[in-house]
Every structure is written in C-alpha cells, then in structure tokens.
Design a protein with these regions (language model features):
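Acidic, Ser/Thr
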Residues: 30-35, 145-149, 258-262, 372-380
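A short beta-strand segment in extracellular, disulfide-stabilized domains
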Residues: 25-28, 139-143, 253-256, 368-374
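Flexible, low-complexity linkers/stalks enriched in Thr/Pro that connect modular domains
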Residues: 1-9, 14, 99, 109-125, ...
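Short beta-strand elements bearing conserved aromatic residues within extracellular beta-rich modules
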Residues: 43-45, 156-158, 269-271, 386-388
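Surface-exposed, short loops/turns at beta-strand junctions within beta-sandwich domains
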Residues: 82-89, 195-202, 308-315
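Short, solvent-exposed loop/linker segments at the N-terminal edge
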Residues: 14-23, 129-138, 243-251, 358-366
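Recognizes extended acidic, P/S/T-rich segments that occur
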Residues: 55-75, 167-190, 280-301, 387-405
Length: 405
C-alpha cells in the first residue's frame, strides 16, 4: 500500500459569531482510504490565522505550524473554542489523513471561515419633521444605509410605532405586538409605508436594525420620527371698512389679515386681489387678466401695502387669502373680504328754512332757527350722516360752524 488516504474539511458557514460557533462543532469533515488498502489510522488538522500567518497549537497561536489530532476517523471533528478566535479574522483549516502503514495525505483538505462578533450599523434620516400625503408618498422618506465591516449585511428590519395609541405597524394594519418588518435591500435599504395607513396630526416613531451574515443583530438602533399632517391651515382677510376714499385709505395696512395652523405651523401666506368691474387681478405692479397670488408682509398676522393710486373710483375689490403649512397643505376654502373705493362726493339736495316743505322766508322767533332738507344722494357708498351750518350770508358759517345732525 503506497497510496495515501484522503480527507475533506467541512465548515458549513463562511461566517460565525460567538453564538453560532458555540451551537455546533463547526470544524469537522470526513476521511477514508481506498478499498483493499491498509485503512485509515487518524486525521490531523492545521488551523492558521490568516491575518498574521500563525497556527493554533491547541493552547495558543504560534508561528510554527502544528498538526493537531482530530477526534474520529471516517467522520472526524475538532473542537476549537470561540475564546480562541479573534473578531474580524479569517481562518484556514487544513486536514491530512494517515493510513495504517504510514502513508500521509499530501493533497490536504481545505476550508475557511471568518469570525465576526461586531454588530452591523444602520442609518436613518427622515428629511422633514412634517409630511402630508403627497409629500410622504413622493419623498419615500423611509430609507437609509446599513454597513458591516466583516461578514456583510444579511437583512434590515424596520419597526414603526404610532404615538397616539402605541400600536405597531405589521405591514397592513396596526397591532399591539412589536413587529419588525423586512426592509427592501440591505446596504441601501428602503421601506414603503403608504400614507393611507397614517392618521392626521399623529407622530410616528421609526427604528431600524440590521443583522449581518454572521448573525450579529444591531442593538443600538437608528431611529427618527415624523408627524403626519393633512389638515390645511386657515387664513382670514380683515378689511376694516366696506368703503374707502383717498383720505381714510391706508396704503400700508388697509389690507390685512391673520392665519394659523394647528400642527406643522405656517409656511407662507399668499393673497390675490380681484377688481370686480372687469375681473382683472392685481399683479403687484399692474392689473392683469390672470389671477396672481402675491406675498404680503408677515404670516400669522399679515398686511399688504397697496397705493391708493392703483384703485379706481366707484369700483369694488375682493381680496382672497390662502395659507400653506410646513407639511405642504394649502388652504382650500380661502379667506375673503371686499371693499369699494369711493372718491365721489354725495349729490346735494334741497334745503328749506323752517320745518315745512315750502321754504320759509321769515320767522318771528328770536331764540330758534329751523330747517329741513331732502333729495341728497350718493350712488356708491351711500349717505351715513348730515352736517349743517348757519351764516348771516348765503354759504356763511359765522353764526354756527358745521355741526353733525
């Protein structure tokens, strides 16, 4: 018998962590000698640390190669404790068999493994704090990265909790059980949470964890949160008077209003001004046929400066306002108020001395004067009051200056 026996090293996995290594005898294999040969005598193994080319002696690592006796024959094992292995290190295991007459295998059995006890890590950065349905579905903000320096990422898991009732998302509903859902992909992972499963004005907490190929599971989770907001803001136009002239019109603040938002807060306010006589819209410098939304000064309390020279006598104007919040919701039922610009004085009517309809030419009273008037009119804003004066000459005011009736 001059033919050597043969052996095979069988290491099931490429990567092991401490728990995985301890679960089973992980260095094992088979050996045999051909039929009609002397038969297998024993099997030895050599274990090399590939990071520094040292060999296991049975108790320590040495620069000299040591062949160590395995347990068994046709099926053999070798016990190497996890405490002898170093995180992040690859090991090469070789086997050689010897037969009954001393022939030694020269084409060694060979397999490798890498020991990995370092947890993977993940990142999660939800770009915004507030989302509405369109913003959430288009941004797909549940995504991030995962990394592992040794064995690589096997899977990424997502945990989603609803703050309003502490329930967890299970992929199609909300339940009391904490359920980690599988993310799509690994190194660049994502998770689809449809907006239809989100409730208005509710905060959601997201946690991410990864598992590497060696079975290490991340324990310091990446986390972030967001608030779902689909309620539009509210705004009002507050125009103090129904009618203005060039004296009481304030170009700085006659057009003003307020706005509010209960969840994400206000982002901006826009107003549009319609000239009702011809359906033209104010564009900021001139009137155009297309509606224009322009920004006033301020947000929660706002004003818009408009010179009275841009207003036309006898014409009414309608001012609309709409708010947009940080989540992107735009007010649909807009604020609205109107005013009319009136520069035309009332039309004078008839004034009669005395209390009768016929003008009185004389009076015998030395203590009282009386008068009546009629047919005064105003086509735009209407008449709200009268003043009278008394003079010793027509149109004079020397006896009594203008006094409100």
């Amino acid at each position: 018998d001059t033919d050597p026996p043969t052996s095979v090293v069988t290491i099931v996995l490429d990567y092991y962590n401490e728990a995985g290594w301890a679960e089973e005898t992980t260095i094992n294999g088979t050996a045999g000698d051909e039929e009609l040969q002397s038969g297998l005598s024993f099997v030895e193994v050599s274990i090399m640390d590939q990071s520094n080319a040292t060999y296991w002696t049975g108790s320590e690592w040495s620069v000299s190669e040591d062949w160590l006796l395995a347990v068994g024959g046709d099926t053999w094992t070798y016990d190497l404790s996890a405490g002898s292995l170093t995180d992040g290190t690859a090991y090469e295991v070789r086997s050689r068999a010897t037969d009954a007459v001393g022939n030694v295998e020269t084409n060694y059995g060979l397999d490798t493994l890498t020991y990995d006890t370092t947890e993977p890590n993940t990142t999660l950065d939800i770009p915004d704090m507030y989302y509405n349905s369109d913003g959430w579905n288009s941004a797909a903000p549940l995504q991030g990265t995962a990394g592992d320096g040794t064995s690589g990422i096997a899977a990424v898991y997502v945990l989603i909790q609803r703050d309003s009732d502490d329930l967890y998302y299970n992929g199609g509903d909300w339940t009391v059980s904490e359920l980690w859902q599988d993310a799509e992909d690994t190194e660049n992972w994502s998770y689809d949470l449809p907006a239809s499963y989100l409730d208005d004005e509710v905060t959601y907490f997201i946690q991410i964890r990864a598992e590497d190929v060696a079975g290490n599971v991340e324990t310091t989770f990446a986390s972030d949160n967001f608030i779902y907001d689909i309620t539009p803001p509210n705004s009002e136009v507050l125009i103090e008077r129904d009618f203005y002239n060039n004296i009481n019109w304030s170009g700085a603040n006659s057009i003003s209003g307020t706005a509010s938002d209960s969840t994400s807060g206000l982002s901006s306010i826009s107003i549009s001004i319609l000239r009702n006589s011809d359906n033209y819209w104010w564009g900021g410098t001139n009137w155009t046929s297309s509606e224009n939304w322009i920004a006033p000064d301020g947000v929660a309390s706002w004003t818009y400066s408009m010179n009275g020279n841009n207003l036309t006598n006898g014409v009414s104007y309608t001012v609309y306002s709409r708010g947009e919040d940080i989540a992107g919701n735009v007010q649909d039922v807009v604020g609205e108020d109107a005013f009319t610009y009136d520069l035309t004085a009332p039309i004078a009517g008839q004034v009669n001395d005395g209390l009768e309809t016929l003008d009185q030419d004389w009076s015998n009273s030395t203590t009282e004067l009386s008068a009546n008037w009629s047919n005064f009119s105003d086509a735009t804003s209407g008449i709200v009051g009268y003043e009278y004066s008394i003079g010793s000459n027509p149109g004079g005011t020397d006896v009594l200056f203008w006094t409100q009736n």
